[in-house]
Amino acid sequence: MKRDILDAKFFDTRIREENIGGKERVLGYFLGPVSVVFLNSILNNYLNVYYTDVVQLGHVWNGWFLTVFPIVVKVLDALTFLLMGIIVDRFYSRQGVARPWILFSAPLLALSFILLFFFPSGNRGLMLIWIFVSYNLFYSIAYTAYNTCHTLLVPLSTRNREQRGKLSVLTNTQGMFSGMLVAVMFPTFVIPAIGISRRNWIVLMAALAAVMLPCVLLEYFYTRERVTEESRKRGEQHIDNVENAGLDHCAEEGKINVGQNAASHKRSMKEQLRLCLQSRSWTVLMIYLVLSQLTGLLASFGTFYYCNWVLGSYNDGYTQALYYAVGNAPLGLGLFLCRPVCKKFGRQNAMAGGFLLAAAGTAVCVWNPQNIKVVLAGQVLKSIGLIPSTYMVSAMLGDALDDVEEKTGVRCDGFSSSVYNIVFTLTTGVAMCILNLGLTQLGYVAPEMDDIPLQNEAVRGFFTFCTVGLPTILYPLIAVVLWMETKRVKTGKKAKQK
């Protein structure tokens, strides 16, 4: 993408206000990205179902294709996230460092999403190659470019913590809203209607991709990078930072873009990692993300199978919808409860206590995993506990980036966004690998058009463990990690006061 093209006024943000207003929140931070979140929610919940039940790839290479494929492509995806982080750290234009890549990714997202479902079926070897290429086109290129920069929009939108906290709640509402929509509509109406017909799946996904494209453009045109603009105006201060870091010649020659963090512009990934690790907040955030994402993703991937083979019957049209609609209903109240609760108890205290409550809820589900009333009660309890963590991740990232800058004098935004997304990417691959390993090795039988099989006890127990068992084990561990950081912060504040 040429920088002179981006200098045209047509590509300027439509947001002129210095403070974040309603138009920016609604169009830029909700309606814009919600389409991508919605489609990604579909992929997280149903792409593996498409592979196992529609295309029936479960027995390819004796089941090892679906076991190895997720982790291989996610490793490649992680590498491209690192590359994208380097690009963002070294890129600057009139439109900012992140927004231009959202514009670039919009058409690629739509095209590659369709190709995930539309592939030749006559030649198995060609089909597997197509799946590999299309998956990497979507995740390693289009989604990587989009999500690296989408992740940065809230931290770069403003330095005002209150406004950033409100944006964090709003942006994380997308995940809840999209997840609920997919969880209720798909098992109730969509999946029973399209069945296991490949043609029906392809037509539906193409229509959804067409709707997504203009929404991504809304996100580009109705957001603004105020922190980037501020950095540009403080160019002289950045040059002083360069000189203090021993890079006087670069400052004198004016080789560093004014809009970039001059001290981080030429730093290697290893050096930026060293700087980030000096921030305890940054380190705790990454540990938290690994544990919470692995737990949440494995539960999410296993939910379809758990609801169809343990809690209810295959595509009965209501079990999975009830599981999500009733079980996750408290998350809707979180839009109004999250900020008051976090303000009263402290963000990390609220999150830590919430995870313990969530663990109690999943323990109720484990106690009687086939009783829908018991499971729904447990899910309601779990959802109440997860309210703080559901809405506060973006704010945690923004605070961690500010803490890195405070500790080191350097902003490592692009690098941190890459690591943030690498955690999401690799935990997705690991979770999918674990799920598919269980499917293929424990004897999962895919349904046919007119034949709904019975699954053995080992398979059913595995689905229960993925969906409600593992969270019962890991949620308390996550709470301990958050509480240790809270205790450290309080100790640090007392030491400063002395």
Please place each PLM-identified region on the residue numbering:
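Membrane-embedded alpha-helical bundles of multi-pass transporters/translocases
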Residues: 2-246, 254-498
